[in-house]
């Protein structure tokens, strides 16, 4: 526990430093820095409050133990023993709570997300499954009270999606959907399969936190913008005007094309929103070793090629391979009942991080 208390003291010292900084007129004048530091201060507050309470309770235990050695009055001894037992119970409770609070927090957990769903291996059936996943996430978002906005789509002739991109906004969206990153495999009999054979197809899901200006600063000189005529729906008007936009971030080579909106201005805004998220995601992977480790852990939140889940329609079964969870309610899950899977993933991730914390 000594290492944990060293970490707690470091958190308390940083909290005091932050309180001084956000009272500094120079920091207050810099709105972006002030917001960033205030957010950090708020994230540490509960930990510091519980740590201070832990120190008070520990002192109470020390004082009561000393008093019992010296006190002879029976009533006072009884009262002190009662107080000591309560203090020890509270100390143990606070110790458990502080360990959980020390688990490294994902700075993106409270962010909105950009989700990209693509049909992968399996042709038309993969595109249809991509559409099924889209509907599943929309229904889950509705249950959470979140808002879903489709910003780009590439539909297939059979009613599926080669690719669909959406922005999901609301409370703690990334914290709940970040574990959806990866390859989702479906096993079912396609409608066109006359022999009744089960086919296996795959769709990939990418989840990126929506980047704020404070997170990523894109230099306009680093962005090449091309405009061209949209090939999407919209009749004569959309083909006569150069409303589609392609943005290239030159330092990383990341390209975003947007033609879903009617006007070039709207497409520019959406393309920039997605470009920021992709660049932010790219730099987090490249530059932060801690973030890299988190993305490659046993729970898995990063690699889109990693097979994370299988949806078996004939047996009405869903299996999450990362935590060995199998649920026989595929019909409900596809209707947006994802809570049990998501909560299980969050608990497994926290348990793993707590184990790492104890072993450090």
Swiss-Prot record:
Protein name per UniProt? Peptide chain release factor 1
Function, as annotated, reads: Peptide chain release factor 1 directs the termination of translation in response to the peptide chain termination codons UAG and UAA.
Modification after translation is described as: Methylated by PrmC. Methylation increases the termination efficiency of RF1.
Q: Which InterPro entries match?
A: PCRF, Pep_chain_release_fac_I, Pep_chain_release_fac_I_sf, Prokaryotic/Mito_RF, RF-1
Q: Which PANTHER family match?
A: LD18447P (PTHR43804:SF7)
- Location in the cell: Cytoplasm
Output the NCBIfam families linked to this UniProt entry: prfA, PRK00591.1
Enumerate the Pfam families for this protein: PCRF (PF03462), RF-1 (PF00472)
Q: Which UniProt keywords apply?
A: Cytoplasm, Methylation, Protein biosynthesis
Name where it mostly resides. Answer: cytoplasm
Q: Pull one GO CC term from this UniProt entry.
A: cytoplasm
PROSITE patterns per UniProt: RF_PROK_I
Q: Which domain of life is it from?
A: Bacteria
Q: Which family would the database say this protein is a member of?
A: Belongs to the prokaryotic/mitochondrial release factor family.
User: Which organism does this record belong to?
Assistant: Limosilactobacillus fermentum (strain NBRC 3956 / LMG 18251)
UniProt GO MF annotations: translation release factor activity, codon specific
Post-translational modification N5-methylglutamine, affected residues: 236
């Amino acid at each position: 526990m000594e290492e944990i208390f060293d970490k707690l003291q470091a958190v308390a010292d940083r909290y005091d430093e932050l309180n001084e900084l956000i009272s500094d007129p120079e920091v207050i004048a810099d709105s972006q820095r002030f917001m960033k530091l205030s957010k950090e201060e708020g994230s540490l507050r509960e930990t510091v409050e519980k740590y201070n309470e832990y120190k008070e309770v520990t002192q109470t235990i020390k004082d009561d133990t000393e008093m019992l050695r010296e006190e002879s009055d029976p009533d006072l001894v009884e009262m002190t023993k009662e107080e000591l037992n309560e203090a020890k119970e509270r100390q143990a409770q606070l110790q458990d709570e502080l360990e959980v609070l020390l688990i490294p927090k994902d700075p993106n957990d409270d962010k909105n997300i950009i989700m990209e769903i693509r049909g992968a291996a399996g042709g038309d059936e993969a595109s249809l499954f991509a559409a099924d996943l889209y509907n599943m996430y929309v229904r889950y978002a509705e249950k959470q009270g979140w808002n879903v906005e489709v910003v780009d789509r590439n539909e297939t002739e059979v009613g599926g999606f080669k690719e669909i991109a959406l922005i999901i906004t609301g409370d703690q969206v990334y914290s709940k959907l970040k574990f959806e990153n990866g390859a989702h495999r479906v096993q079912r009999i396609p409608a066109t399969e006359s022999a009744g054979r089960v086919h296996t197809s795959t769709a990939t899901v990418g989840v990126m936190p929506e980047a704020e200006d404070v997170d990523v600063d894109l230099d306009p000189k680093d962005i090449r913008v091309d405009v061209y005529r949209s090939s999407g729906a919209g009749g004569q008007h959309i083909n006569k005007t150069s409303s589609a936009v392609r943005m290239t971030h030159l330092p990383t080579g990341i390209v975003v094309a947007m033609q879903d909106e009617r006007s070039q201005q709207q497409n520019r805004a959406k393309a920039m929103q997605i470009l920021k998220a992709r660049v932010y995601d790219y730099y987090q992977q490249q530059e932060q070793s801690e973030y890299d480790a988190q993305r490659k852990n046993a729970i898995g939140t990063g690699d889109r090629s990693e097979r994370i889940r299988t949806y078996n329609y004939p047996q009405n079964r869903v299996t999450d391979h990362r935590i060995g969870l199998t649920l026989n309610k595929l019909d409900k899950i596809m209707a947006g009942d994802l809570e049990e899977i998501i909560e299980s993933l969050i608990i497994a991730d926290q348990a793993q991080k707590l184990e790492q914390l104890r072993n450090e």
